[in-house]
C-alpha cells in the first residue's frame, strides 16, 4: 500500500525502482528494492533515511536497519562492468546477486551501465582500494548530476519532492494497476483530468546556465527550473523545468540574472 508498485510480483534476484507516495500523491522518496528469495533490501536516498524509517514505523512496517553497518558504492561508467567483473560475477541489467562479502545490483542512475555494491563497513576500504588499483577514480555528486541530466533522469529533491507527484515528474511508468496504494485517488485524478504540472527537458544554445529556481516562460505558460547544468558531452546547458500546464510551444525564455535567454524544450 505504501508504494505504487506491486512488490509481490518481483522475481527473485530482481531489482525494482519504485516510489513511496504521500496521501496527497506526492513523492516521499524514490527507492530501489532488491529481491532475494524471502528478503527485500530497500535502498533509499541517504538524505531521506530518517524520513523513510519514520514513514515505515508510522505504518507498522517491521524491518532490520542496516544503515550504520553497511556502505553502498556505485561503480559507474563505460568500463565499470569489465572492471567489477574481475571481482564478482555480473548479473544481467536490473538484476541482483550476492556472495559472502558483496551484495550488489546492476542498476545505476547515471545513464551509464554500472554496479551498486553493498558491503559491511569493515570491507569498504579494501573494496575502494581494489577499485583504485584498477585506476577507477572517485567522484562526487556533481558528476552524478550531469550524468543523470544527460540521461533525463529525475532526482529526488529537485524533480521529485513533497510537492511533485510521479505523474508530474514524468514517472507515470512506475505506477502499476494495483487496486489501491497511498495517494492513488489523487494520482488517478491527475491522469484522468490532466490537471497537473508538467516536467520538460530543455537545452540552451548559449553559455548561460539556467540554475534551479530560474523562472522561465514558454508562450503564455510559466515554469521554474528544477535542475540545470552544463552538459560536458553536449557542450551546452541542459536541464529540467516544471510548468504549470503543458506548453504547446517548444521555445522557452529563461530569466537569468535579468537577461532573457532563449532555449528549446
Locate the predicted segments by residue.
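Internal amphipathic helical hairpin motif
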Residues: 1-29, 78-100
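Conserved, structured C-terminal
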Residues: 33-265
